[in-house]
Amino acid sequence: MKQIKRVLKILAAGLLLGILAICLVYLLPCGSLQKHASESLKNAGQEKLHPKILKTEGENPFLLEGYKGSSLDNYTDTLMITQAVYQSEEPFYKAAMLSERKNNGKDQPIESLREYLENLQSGEVVSYSRYWHGYLVVLKPLLAVMDYGKIRMLNLAAFLLIQVLLLIGFLKRKL
């Protein structure tokens, strides 16, 4: 019985922490997020050196041609960015729970994001509140200070750091 109570307390604490975290990032002003998302749509032609994103890369470009494991999912990334930059008219706590974004009615999230950033009034408001959008807890603050290309580079650096730390751990244990 003690074990069940402990698990329920941990679950409740996690739930409250998740709600608090998502509500806090919805307090961030969307101006800088929209500016950096807009920068991510520009600077075409530099993808090989510094991936700026989206419009010129398309929805699923390959880093290594023909190798499916190197495919980038710009389609989903764009949906996530659109979710992050949307300025809801609802209070922050309600906006955090509704998870709204603008959609142009077509199945083209890159165009939908571009249209929203060019004309903040265009498109219909779509809500996707089925699950907790925890990625926004990280994405919104990062997008407030850098564009998507830099976020990709930061992600790569974090991935490489984790790989090096794992390798060091394996070497220490002689595995």
Regions found by a protein language model. Name each.
Residues 39-56:
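Short extracytoplasmic/periplasmic juxtamembrane "stem" segments immediately C-terminal to an N-terminal membrane anchor
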